């Protein structure tokens, strides 16, 4: 009897739950289309459709903000109306049609295609993460490793998507590129449908309703999807208003979550929800700096970094692949490393990782003023400094992002898991808008030189770096408190 129990416990600790491996491949394929659009939208709009750079960048900003902002609603819609797996497949179908419309190479097709794509991608990311977190019990430590693997799969999708986008960009064959994006989306649908039964929802409000109620909710959910497309189409044409709207919505959602938390009756769950709110505030600082990559950091790389490396001209967009490589390689390695440290008695937990991530981000910013100080006579900064910065930022991302997703299952009561997962992802949407405001504080490069703009960049990077380090110190001080808030009392037999 004892041997049987030990075997069962050992299997529980080592075996991968059914569906977790499938979701790795689903994540990879689902990311392809987003990677293509994310990396090509501005170039496509300016080179093929004749948009001004300001117009194209404004659309890209709204694209990023609403992609993340819709994550919160995706958790609610999936958990209460459509089910996570149904909403995921419907979202991928919208992405297929969206990419096909964009491939028509017209302005009308672009706006409607983006609206359909955003509706799908914004809603289904939360569903994918919820399908994964529901494979594990709240106290199952394997959840963190599974999310690290899943996060590596997502970045593998980004790597492939960026590589293919660059290949077609050389010939500006955008039609073929966006049609390729539809193939990735279709592959994600096929894999999901092939493993449909093992990806069923667990412990969501929708599981508790009758068949007739489920059908009514399904109809309402589909109607919401249909209405969202023209609404997002309209908001894409009003980028400034949309940015303010995302920030205001984020503030309202955080305020509502605070009220819900303090009114929650279960003392243990209320304590863990408070820890969630504190960690969310800390993560906002990290993601605000992280989202500078396609904005202020991209312009700094293009204008102030020496991009001739060993005689090879490096495109600014390729620098993003430093992040992708670190995540793909580092994700599984960090999972193995953390498992070994825990076996040796190290307390590697959520508060410690969050604090460490902010230190990494701060150092990633602070190496740039050092590189600027050591710049050549022409003001160009050596490529190694931006590379080091991205490596440090990527390590910070590994510490906070997949662990942030995994912590929802640990801290959120079952009835709030979908909404809290969406709120967590909406933090990134708000951070994206705030990053655009910070980018506006950086020097303007038009008609200037690196020698003139370097002091301004150095000042901003110093402020951002020390701000991130200071936030990391605050979380470091709060680690004992956060650990007490997160701790679960042992159940009484």
Residue ranges and their predicted role:
Residues 80-92, 340-359:
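Cytoplasmic membrane-interface "Motif A"-like loop-to-helix N-cap segments
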Residues 37-55, 293-319:
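Short amphipathic helix-loop junctions that connect adjacent transmembrane helices
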Residues 61-78, 125, 321-334:
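Central cavity-lining transmembrane alpha-helices of secondary-active solute carriers
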Residues 93-111, 356-378:
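C-terminal ends and interior cores of transmembrane alpha-helices
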């Amino acid at each position: 009897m004892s041997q049987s129990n030990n075997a069962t416990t050992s299997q529980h600790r080592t075996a991968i739950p059914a569906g977790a491996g499938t979701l790795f491949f689903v994540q990879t394929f689902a990311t392809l289309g987003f990677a293509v659009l994310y990396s090509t939208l501005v170039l496509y709009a300016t080179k093929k459709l004749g948009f001004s750079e300001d117009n194209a960048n404004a659309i890209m900003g709204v694209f990023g903000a609403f992609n993340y902002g819709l994550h919160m609603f995706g958790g609610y819609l999936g958990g209460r109306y459509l089910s996570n797996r149904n909403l995921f497949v419907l979202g991928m179908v919208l992405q297929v049609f969206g990419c096909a419309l964009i491939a028509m190479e017209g302005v009308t097709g672009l706006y409607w295609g983006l609206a359909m794509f955003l509706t799908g991608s914004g809603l289904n990311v939360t569903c994918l993460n919820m399908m994964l977190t529901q494979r594990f019990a709240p106290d199952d430590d394997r959840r963190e490793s599974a999310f690290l693997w899943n996060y590596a799969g997502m970045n593998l999708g980004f790597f492939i998507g960026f590589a293919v986008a660059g290949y077609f960009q050389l010939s500006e064959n955008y039609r073929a590129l966006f049609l390729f994006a539809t193939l990735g989306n279709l592959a994600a649908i096929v894999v999901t449908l092939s493993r449909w039964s093992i990806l069923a929802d667990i412990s969501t409000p929708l599981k508790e309703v009758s068949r007739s109620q489920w059908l009514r909710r399904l109809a309402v959910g589909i109607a919401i999807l249909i209405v969202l497309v023209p609404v997002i189409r309209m908001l894409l044409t009003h980028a400034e208003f949309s940015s303010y709207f995302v920030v205001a919505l984020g503030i309202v959602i955080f305020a509502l979550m605070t009220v819900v938390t303090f009114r929650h009756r279960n003392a243990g769950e209320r304590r863990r929800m408070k820890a969630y709110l504190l960690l969310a505030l800390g993560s906002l600082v990290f993601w605000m700096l992280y989202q500078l990559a396609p904005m202020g950091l991209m312009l700094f790389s293009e204008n102030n970094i020496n991009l001739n490396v060993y005689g090879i001209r490096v495109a600014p967009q390729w620098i993003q692949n430093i992040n992708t490589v670190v995540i793909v390689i580092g994700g599984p390695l960090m999972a193995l490393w953390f498992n070994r440290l825990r076996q040796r008695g190290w307390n590697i937990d959520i508060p410690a990782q969050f604090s460490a991530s902010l230190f990494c981000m701060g150092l990633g910013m602070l190496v740039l003023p050092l590189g600027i100080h050591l710049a050549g006579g022409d003001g160009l900064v050596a490529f190694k400094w931006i590379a080091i910065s991205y490596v440090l930022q990527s390590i910070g991302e590994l510490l906070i992002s997949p662990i942030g997703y995994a912590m929802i299952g640990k801290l959120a009561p079952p009835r709030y898991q979908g909404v809290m997962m969406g709120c967590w992802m909406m933090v990134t949407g708000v951070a994206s808008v705030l990053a655009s405001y910070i980018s506006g504080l950086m020097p303007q490069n038009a008609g200037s030189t690196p020698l003139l703009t370097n002091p301004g960049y150095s000042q901003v990077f110093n402020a951002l770096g020390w701000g991130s380090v200071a936030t990391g110190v605050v979380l470091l001080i709060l680690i004992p408190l956060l650990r007490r808030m997160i701790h679960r009392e042992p159940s009484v037999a």
